[in-house]
Swiss-Prot record:
InterPro entries per record: FAD/NAD-bd_sf, GIDA_C_N, MnmG, MnmG-rel, MnmG-rel_CS, MnmG_C, MnmG_C_subdom, MnmG_C_subdom_sf
Protein name: tRNA uridine 5-carboxymethylaminomethyl modification enzyme MnmG
One Pfam family linked to the record: SAM_GIDA_C
Sequence similarity: Belongs to the MnmG family.
Organism: Desulfitobacterium hafniense (strain Y51)
Gene3D superfamilies: FAD/NAD(P)-binding domain, GidA associated domain, C-terminal subdomain, tRNA uridine 5-carboxymethylaminomethyl modification enzyme MnmG/GidA
Molecular-function GO terms, alphabetical: flavin adenine dinucleotide binding
A cellular component annotation (GO) from this entry: cytosol
Cofactor(s), by name: FAD
Keywords: Cytoplasm, FAD, Flavoprotein, NAD, tRNA processing
Length: 637
């Protein structure tokens, strides 16, 4: 028997990384928000690796923070170790990776939710989405509670018809022994949504006392306390000093390891037919790596701590769904793990996902106004991709409450824009992972300038509050002062200190007056050299110095990418009417017509990026729209 349990502006179903960001964003923008979770004890739980970031993923976390999201703040506060990756390459691919304390991360995020105004938290299992006149009207739980709301955000992760697989053992369930939502998939199908089936997996966890660390190579954190959040007051390491970071450890599998896997490959669910879902290309299981790369005698593994007070080590690189007894043999064949105690076996999990071509760029389901989906439910992998989608969905649900236009991030504005654009226009055939190679404008979309790109937009929608805005304005002013300082400082060729600094980095001597800006353009000159020559620069924040230096050193390349963005923007401005009937357009290819109907692109720029739509289809569409415009059947754009 149903009963009305409450009225809200926004309901978020699922309190993983997507759900937390969605609920916090909607509430912070003034929407009366309800967050429903299967378990209050698993909010923002890291079901797989205890880390955040890396290439593209770290960029996303900074973009989430720049917009006023929570993930970066929580990651910084609960960090175990920080490392800046790819420092030997250009700034476009520099990426922060933070090792997190799983339990502390969960507690910090839960406290943020419990302390948030306009946000109510409740434990329940949602079984149905209710609609009225084709629009969302609320959700119904297993106990019959009806929560009414015109906006519902589904962030159910890997919990839709979840099935755990360990060798021959298979059972219904969510990650780490949690319950799963078995009926919600059917309810979504009744609403007309097309679902698919994916799988992912996780490695075993072992006891830290059972490892012989002398057979591993230590991987310490950086001495610089890098952080995700642009807030200068953000604390790190749960209040500890930077020299208290916990290391990770590098090791390798052996030919013996690979032989054990090959001898038992017939028992691997991935190869025995027990797993039907498609797994992630960029995070293969160890059995998959052994089969696909049979010529390689070893593979890297990393032992990653799961918390300051946890005895568990996450064995990165050893994801597996092999039978439990075989997992013991695999682990004990690795040098240093001969006596390892297995605390949790690795497993695979299959789950349903919503095919994302059914969404608009706001993450609203096009056919069901008020219904949004975000996170792994949309066919992605990774905490960061999930959180970014949740943030966007939360913003757009709140804007819908306010009767405002959707918030769309373009590909040229952020990795968040690349992520959403790829999902909607290209679809997914395997769990989607964001990569720097997917972005056309990598030099523009650096992690260091995420705030310059997106914080003003977060301010416009009401998510960036006064304290963050003041910090942003201070950084912008500092960058302007730094630029003025080294542009206005000129050095004589007779300056002995200049000659010493240049000789120290094997830079050519100068034969005439030279400015600090001109010096900075030299590849071998870094901020450190400029600070030696212009002592006043020591007064400025390192982030502001870094940003100003990159903009000068790479000015030519940045200008070229900005010109490309401007040219492409003209295609984005050519709008496609919502009422267009693609079946009436002669000359479209069969696949192109089908994909255009499925995605319903809002503009020509989006149409060009749809998988299956050819350049010939674009030409036909442009001619058709121009004919209609000249005939007065559509408005000029």
């Amino acid at each position: 028997m149903e009963y009305l349990a409450g009225n809200y502006d926004v309901i978020v179903v699922g309190a993983g990384h997507a759900g937390c960001e969605a609920a916090l964003a909607a509430a912070r923008m003034g929407g009366r928000t309800l967050l429903i979770t299967l378990s209050l004890d698993n909010i923002a739980h890291m079901d797989c690796n205890p880390s955040l970031g890396g290439p593209a993923k770290g960029h996303l976390v900074r973009e989430i923070d720049a917009l006023g999201g929570q993930m970066g703040i929580t990651a910084d506060e609960t960090s175990l170790q920080v490392r800046m990756l790819n420092t030997g390459k250009g700034p476009a691919v520099h990426a922060l990776r933070i090792q997190s304390d799983k339990q502390a991360y969960h507690l910090h995020m839960r406290n943020a939710i419990l302390g948030q105004e306009n946000l109510v938290l409740h434990q329940a299992l949602v079984e149905r989405i209710k609609t009225e006149d084709g629009k969302v009207s609320g959700v119904v739980t297993r106990t019959g509670a009806f929560y009414a709301a015109p906006n519902v955000i589904l962030t159910s992760g890997t919990y839709l018809r979840g099935r755990i697989i360990i060798g021959d053992a298979m059972y219904e369930g969510g990650p780490n022994g949690q319950q799963t939502a078995m009926n919600l998939s059917g309810a979504l199908k009744e609403l007309g949504l097309e679902l698919g089936r994916f799988k992912t997996g996780t490695p075993p966890r072992i006891h830290r006392r059972s490892v012989d660390y002398t057979k591993f190579t230590v991987q310490p954190g950086d001495s610089v306390p890098w952080r995700y959040s642009f807030m200068p007051t953000q604390s790190m390491f749960w209040g500890r000093d930077v020299d208290k970071q916990i290391p990770c450890w590098l090791g390798y599998t052996t030919p013996e390891t690979h032989q054990i896997i090959q001898d038992n490959i017939h028992r691997a669910p991935l190869y025995s037919g027990k797993i039907e879902g498609i797994g992630p290309r960029y995070c293969p299981s160890i059995e998959d790596k052994v089969v696909r790369f049979a010529d390689r005698p070893t593979h890297q593994i990393f032992l990653e701590p799961e918390g300051w007070n946890s005895d568990e080590l996450y064995v990165a690189g050893l994801s597996t769904s092999m039978p439990e007894e075989i997992q013991y043999d695999i682990i004990h064949s690795i040098p240093g793990l001969e006596k390892a105690e297995l605390l949790r076996p690795g497993y695979a999990i299959e789950y349903d996902y919503v095919k994302p071509y059914q969404l608009s760029l706001s993450l609203e389901v096009r056919r069901i106004p008020g219904l949004f989906t975000a996170g792994q439910l949309n066919g992605t992998s990774g905490y960061e991709e999930a959180a970014a989608q949740g943030l966007l969905a939360g913003i757009n649900a709140a804007l819908r409450v306010q009767g405002k236009e959707p918030f769309i991030v373009r590909r040229s504005e952020g990795y968040l824009g690349v992520l959403i654009d790829d999902l909607v226009n290209k679809g997914v055939k395997e769990p989607y992972r964001l990569l720097t190679s997917r972005a056309e404008y990598r030099l523009i979309l650096r992690q260091d300038n995420a705030d310059l790109r997106l914080t003003p937009r977060g301010r416009e929608v009401g998510l960036v509050k006064d304290e963050r805005w003041a910090a942003f304005q201070k950084k912008k002013a500092a960058i302007a002062e730094i630029n003025a300082l080294w542009r206005g400082t000129t050095f004589s060729p007779l300056n002995e200190h200049l000659a010493e600094v240049l000789a120290g980095v094997h830079s050519a001597p100068v034969h005439g007056g030279i400015s600090g800006e001109e010096l900075m353009r030299r590849p071998e000159i870094t901020i450190n050299e400029i600070k030696q020559l212009i002592p006043q620069l020591a007064e400025y924040d390192e982030e502001a110095l870094l940003e100003a230096g990159i903009e000068i050193k790479y000015a030519g390349y940045i200008e070229k990418q900005l010109a490309e963005i401007e040219r492409f923007a003209k295609m984005e401005e050519r709008m496609i009417p919502e009422e267009i009937v693609y079946d009436q357009i002669k000359g479209l290819s069969t696949e192109g017509r089908q994909r255009l109907k499925e995605v319903a692109p809002a503009n020509m720029g989006q149409a060009t990026r749809i998988t299956g739509v050819t350049p010939a289809d674009i030409s036909v569409l442009l001619v058709y729209l121009e004919q209609k415009r000249r005939g007065g059947q559509i408005h000029a754009t």
